């Protein structure tokens, strides 16, 4: 039962990371000034 709980936790964390990556990509496309530094870093991370 504990293994199942860990699996659910990992899936939720991965889903959040994917959603966050999508949000950053959208913001980069919009060329939001605040996100310009994050976008530079984001280009080096292979999403």
Curated annotation (Swiss-Prot):
Membrane protein topology class = Single-pass membrane protein
Q: Which domain of life is it from?
A: Bacteria
Cleavable signal peptide:
none
Give the UniProt entry's GO cellular component terms.
Answer: plasma membrane
Chief location of this protein?
membrane
Keywords, A to Z, come to: Cell inner membrane, Cell membrane, Membrane, Transmembrane, Transmembrane helix
Instruction: Name the GO terms of the biological process aspect.
Output: negative regulation of phosphorelay signal transduction system
Does the record bear Transmembrane in its keywords? yes
Q: Does Cell membrane show up as a keyword for this record?
A: yes
The listed locations are: Cell inner membrane
Pfam families noted in UniProt: MgrB
Alphabetical list of InterPro entries matching this protein: MgrB
Task: Write out the transmembrane intervals.
Answer: 6-26
Against PROSITE patterns, the record matches this protein to: PROKAR_LIPOPROTEIN (PS51257)
Q: What does this protein do?
A: PhoP-regulated transcription is redox-sensitive, being activated when the periplasm becomes more reducing. MgrB acts between DsbA/DsbB and PhoP/PhoQ in this pathway. Represses PhoP/PhoQ signaling, possibly by binding to the periplasmic domain of PhoQ, altering its activity and that of downstream effector PhoP.
**Similarity-based family:** Belongs to the MgrB family.
Quaternary context: May form homooligomers. Probably interacts with the periplasmic domain of PhoQ.
Query: Mind telling me which NCBIfam families this protein's record contains?
Result: PRK10299.1
By what name is this protein known? PhoP/PhoQ regulator MgrB
Organism, per UniProt? Escherichia fergusonii (strain ATCC 35469 / DSM 13698 / CCUG 18766 / IAM 14443 / JCM 21226 / LMG 7866 / NBRC 102419 / NCTC 12128 / CDC 0568-73)
Source taxonomy: Bacteria, Pseudomonadati, Pseudomonadota, Gammaproteobacteria, Enterobacterales
């Amino acid at each position: 039962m504990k293994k199942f709980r860990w699996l659910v936790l990992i899936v939720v964390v991965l889903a959040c990371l994917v959603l966050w990556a999508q949000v950053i990509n959208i913001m980069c496309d919009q060329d939001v000034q605040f996100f310009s530094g994050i976008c530079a870093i984001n280009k080096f991370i292979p999403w």
